[in-house]
Amino acid sequence: LEQDDNNEIRAFVLNGESIKSLEKLKCKIYYGDVTKKETLLPLFENIDDKEVFVIHCAAVVYIKTKYNPLVYNVNVNGTKNVVDKVIETKAKLIYISSVHAIPEKENNDLIEEITDFNPDEVHGLYAKTKAEAAKYVMNAVKNKNLNACIIHPSGIIGPYDYGNSHLTELVREVSNGKLFATVKGGYDFVDVRDVAAAIITASKKDNKGECYILSNRYITIKELSDLICDVQGIKKIKIVLPICLAKIIAPFFEVYY
């Protein structure tokens, strides 16, 4: 975005959060909280004569089983506040959702984009909040003339992860030789640079009401760990635990972390 001198880039940052990822970028920083609608006001000032695109990617990624009200407040209520402000200012919204907002199919069949979201059809707090938020976006598209599209990335992986996501932590643990075992199963991963490029492309298209899955291919955790070990020149992890055992011990790791 900053490669185009005509673009004015504004970043909305939660108070107290690190801005290390933005330090070398040509953008103006606004501090606030998506759950507090009034803090969004300065972000949308002086835009009457501009074509405005809002990329909403603020969210709390949550994999624990215990209910956390912050997840709902940010992922759902925060999205509602952003949507309402975008409607008011007649901007275009690119909402960054997740593949978890889409119901899984039986036998791990391939999922496809949907436009009708139902939190009751997905599992886990994070998935339910992303589905409910996506539902709000699509309802606003249909009933309030919101110009928006939805992006559904799979597991985002790649460089410049200043927030140390779960996947980045996994890569570091393997790289440092701290994991003695992996688990069966895997995931569909997507490079963060491809996600960024897709978001920019989506902002330029006439795609009101469209949804896009961003993914690559299924990779087992063992395959990923082997690749990391090859790059690092260290011994590969030989122990692979069944997923049922991983589910049993997961609550203990939740307490630990």
Regions picked out by a protein language model, each given a short descriptive name:
Residues E121-C149:
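Active-site Tyr-X1-5-Lys
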Residues K144-L146, G158-E169, A202-Y212, I234-K236:
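Glycine/proline-rich active-site loop of Rossmann-fold NAD(P)-dependent oxidoreductases
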Residues A198-Y257:
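Mid/C-terminal beta-alpha module of Rossmann-like enzyme folds, strongest
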Residues F53, N77-Y126:
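Conserved Rossmann-fold NAD(P)-dependent oxidoreductase catalytic core, especially the SDR/UDP-sugar
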Residues I63, V99-D109, I156-Y162:
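Conserved catalytic-site region of short-chain dehydrogenase/reductase
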Residues P119-D120, E169-V190, D194:
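A conserved pocket-lining segment of Rossmann-fold NAD(P)-dependent short-chain dehydrogenase/reductase
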Residues E17-S21, C27-N77, K85:
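NAD(P)H-binding glycine-rich loop region in Rossmannoid oxidoreductase-like domains
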